[in-house]
Structure formats: C-alpha cells, structure tokens
Amino acid sequence: MDYEFLRDITGVVKVRMSMGHEVIGHWFNEEVKENLALLDEVEDAARTLKGSERSWQRAGHEYTLWMDGEEVMVRANQLEFAGDEMEEGMNYYDEESLSLCGVEDFLQVVAAYRNFVQQK
C-alpha cells in the first residue's frame, strides 16, 4: 500500500493512496483533517482489539472506518450492500467507495500521517 502526503497552497495536508486504497486517503482528507485526537482514538481501538474477536467502528460525515484485530475497512457512508439484488456468487466492490487493508499497514500510514502533520 503506497501513499503520499502533500500540502496544498493553503497548507492543508492531503493524502494520496495507491490504487485500491484510494478510499483510505479520502478518509484522511475528509474525516481526519489533521485531527490527531481522532488518530489517537483509532490507535487506542486497534490496541484494544488486538488478539480479540471484537470489532470497532467510527462513523464520520462521509466515511465509516471499521476494524477488527486483523483488518481495517473504510467505506463511503452512501455505499449500501443490497445483497438481495446481487447475483449469487457476485461480490460488490467499488474502489471509489470501499478499501480494505491490514491493521498493521493502516497503523503505519496513521503514524506517517501524524509525523507529516507535526512537521509544520
């Protein structure tokens, strides 16, 4: 999972993620917006979930972050899974609306984002 942090002309941090993980970048850009307290909450949840069967989620304005002890999912709130309308054996995946990654990879991006934001 590749990522890049940039500052726009006004100094706002923007995240760009590799193909298949774009929604994670959108989550940082739309929900985090340099709010390090939110990142603290996510990191605390990850520590609590490690080695357990529980899951945790944080719904935002545009995106919801869900995680368990192994995986992180970020999805657009407008995305609805209409299982009855899907053909048997078909999975719904929209790279503009849903991204999955491992918890450790996600926490590496969180740490790198935090470091970049603090370099002002």
UniProtKB/Swiss-Prot annotation:
Top-level taxon of origin: Bacteria
Stored InterPro entries: UPF0231
Family (UniProt): Belongs to the UPF0231 family.
NCBIfam families referenced in this protein's UniProt entry, alphabetically: PRK05248.1-1 (NF003574), PRK05248.1-3 (NF003576)
Protein name: UPF0231 protein YacL
Gene source species: Escherichia coli O6:K15:H31 (strain 536 / UPEC)
Gene: yacL
